[in-house]
């Protein structure tokens, strides 16, 4: 499989303070990579570099000419009083090369319907975005990330605002999407993502790539990504310990 994006010896940061140092990562077609690491370890910085939102200090980035990225950020803000319908929020995710300001064609409207059915909100097509819960809005923003048919989907803590009743369905949907595209999934919940991703990248100043989804305490400790147990109800989850430094 060909690489969609290849990062070589990337160093990046802010105001000349290095957050990532000598990072190497190759994302192939149909990869499903879980990105883990402590707060301040550089996960967000890595995403910014991949999304061209931050120029690295050094290193090179090679992108396949066919690369199309769909991005679901951790926090999506929208004025719930703004008079926009669900279908129009989704259509706003079209790439500028498709002239998103033009009236959408029949095939694009059909795609909206297919995506809404895919996430279980088929009856909300013409609803105002303000009528939706936070979790439902997150699902709509996922559709927005998918409307342009990306071959790389980037998700930053996608279950943050998703309804708990839909969380399991979300991960099943991502498994289906992985048949069509590569996925980068950022999460603090090691136990959850290790059961679904194919490989793991631990980001903590550098990037340590683990070519498997089998994550043990020993692996995380060797990569300087310590974990701790937290309780969600009666179920313990393995998550990364909090680091206060950037």
PLM features: residue spans?
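Conserved ABC ATPase "signature" region
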Residues: 105-124
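Conserved ABC ATPase signature
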Residues: 128-132, 136
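H-loop (His-switch) and adjacent beta-strand-loop-beta switch element
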Residues: 198-214
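Hydrophobic anchor residue at the start of the ABC signature
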Residues: 142-143, 170
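Helix-to-loop junction immediately C-terminal to a conserved catalytic motif
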Residues: 51
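Catalytic Walker B motif of ABC-type/P-loop ATPase nucleotide-binding domains
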Residues: 153-157
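ABC ATPase nucleotide-binding domains
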Residues: 214-246
